[in-house]
Amino acid sequence: MTTTDTAPQSQPFQAEVAELLNLMVHSVYSETDIFLRELISNASDALDKLRYESIAKPELMADGGEPKIRILPKKEPDTLSVIDNGLGMDRQELIDNLGTIAKSGTKSFLTKLTEAKDGAGLIGQFGVGFYAAFMVADRIVVTSRRARSAEAWTWSSSGGAGFEIAPASEEDAARVTRGTEIVLHLKKDAAKYLEPYEIERVVGAYSDNIQFPIELVPEEGEPRQINSASALWQRSKSELTAEDYSQAYKQIAGAFDEPAMTLHYRAEGRYSYAVLLFAPSTKPFDLFEPARKGRVKLYVRRVFITDEADLLPSYLRFIRGVIDSEDLPLNLSREMLQNNPQLAQIRKAVTGKVIGELESLGDKDPEAFGKIWDAFGLVIKEGIWEDYERRDKLLALSRFTTTKGENRTLKQYVEDLKENQTEIYYLVGDSIERLKSNPKLESAAARGIEVLLLTDPVDAFWTSAPLDFGGKPLKSLSQGDVDFGQIPTTEENKDEQAKPETDEALTIAAIKDALGDKVSDVRASQRLTASASCLVAGGLGPDRALERMLAQQNRGAASKPILEVNLRHPIVAAVAKANAADAADLSLLLLEQAQILDGELPEDPAAFSARLNRLVLRAL
């Protein structure tokens, strides 16, 4: 090619790339096969992009032949080449795509990759698989020509602090007429990847369902296709095995685990489309990154369009797979994707199918569903807050730890309601252990009432919506009034129903006088049987747990709580009989004890300590 400056230009890697390359160059990961899977996946993406852009610009397909991927092993020197005749890259795209990682969550990814015993799965999840090639190569040379461009460029690196980029030599430019050629100079311990049978093994395991032909070009003999090159989702379920689905999942999702759920069907009628979706069995590292998109790919008549179409609601963002429409136009713009009524109908129908399949799995295979719930239950519960239309189904799908055990459903809860019980009770907190010892459970426990123990951060939000299940409203034990009067205590707790001997009005008045505006109210508790006091929120505001969470995020100050006291408790009974100073100390102690039990610090820890010491010394 002709150029005025053919000298290579050296450029440094972005800091995150340099750190990632250092991990790859000195990799101890056992799954080195990932490098070939990732390079083939990138080549397939480039062919997809070419096919998509050629819809509007057919001339892009004029040079370079039919779309395919070629793998060339050469033992003299020890090089392995992966070549595609896809869209290709220009100089700036080579720099941007191979010299930087323009993704949110990069630091989190690198931290997890450093800590992982085997990071191969993380590499695929984050979409930086090109760099995995440095696990097997000590030098990589990439030559690329964008479709219909007069110029080809060569990028090269030995995995150090930077890379070189230069116009391609005449020989390289003549060889790469469209697309990208990646040449790996293999390390000595990676020589096995030069063997045709080893290449076929890796392609068969990870890339068999790539839609484009993958050709193995041996040093001796004729090139031959080594993958099936079929859109698996277009085939009948009866033709496919569990192994077929496993391979398709790993190829589509860039994963190493097995799918916990597979949903494959074809919709016919007003709109026709094929669906192949998977629920992973392990949680991806970036599940809660704010910028994380869904991972479902949209195809139109087997042409890849985008993976940014929000084909499922955000609370199903862990689902991976493909939706292939027969009816959508191929030239969909991003704006059209957002406003296309046909796509909205597909989204609604597929979302319903996914939730239905999860329900069915929960009934038929609790163990498989348990893997999904353990990994993604926290995300699914976001939908209870976000998706009013499907709220009841998501509540039915949810599994809870309760005072009766783990993995309980609301259906089971309602079936086990106590005599005269009309509400579903729950308590939100930081940990199961702390919730189990929370004094607000005492009166419920005395009656054998089951209580949901909620510890995920999202629980404080979805429970703030007005909810019911099976006609039974959900009720927080940390908010508003609780009346267990119509529900009898168990035989061993009969004494809990005995009336207190303490003068309620006098005691409440004394505590209110001592606490002043530190609380919004003081009242006798229906929640407590053994503890002296607890704090609750008013009936109309948010739950105490949500108030604390919002306050910690500077999204509003927590309102003043209500102090509930157990009139049967000796400390509470002592307030009305004590002198003014002791009554004040006892009242403040009741408040501060309740704060500690709620996971809060007393307003003045030093004063709390001094007050406690005074009361103890007086009792000696």
Curated annotation (Swiss-Prot):
Domain of life: Bacteria
GO cellular component, one term: cytoplasm
Cell compartment(s), UniProt: Cytoplasm
Region (A) location: 1-334
Function: Molecular chaperone. Has ATPase activity.
Matches recorded under PANTHER family: HEAT SHOCK PROTEIN 90 FAMILY MEMBER (PTHR11528)
Gene3D superfamilies: 3.30.230.80, 3.40.50.11260, Heat shock protein 90, C-terminal domain, Histidine kinase-like ATPase, C-terminal domain
Protein name stated in the entry: Chaperone protein HtpG
Assembly: Homodimer.
Annotated keywords: ATP-binding, Chaperone, Cytoplasm, Nucleotide-binding, Stress response
Organism classification: Bacteria, Pseudomonadati, Pseudomonadota, Alphaproteobacteria, Hyphomicrobiales
Region B, annotated ranges: 335-548
NCBIfam families: PRK05218.1
Organism of origin: Rhodopseudomonas palustris (strain BisB18)
Pfam families: HATPase_c_3, HSP90
One annotated GO molecular function: unfolded protein binding
Family: Belongs to the heat shock protein 90 family.
Region C: start-end pairs: 549-620
Database matches in InterPro entries: HATPase_C_sf, HSP90_C, Hsp90_fam, Hsp90_N, Ribosomal_Su5_D2-typ_SF
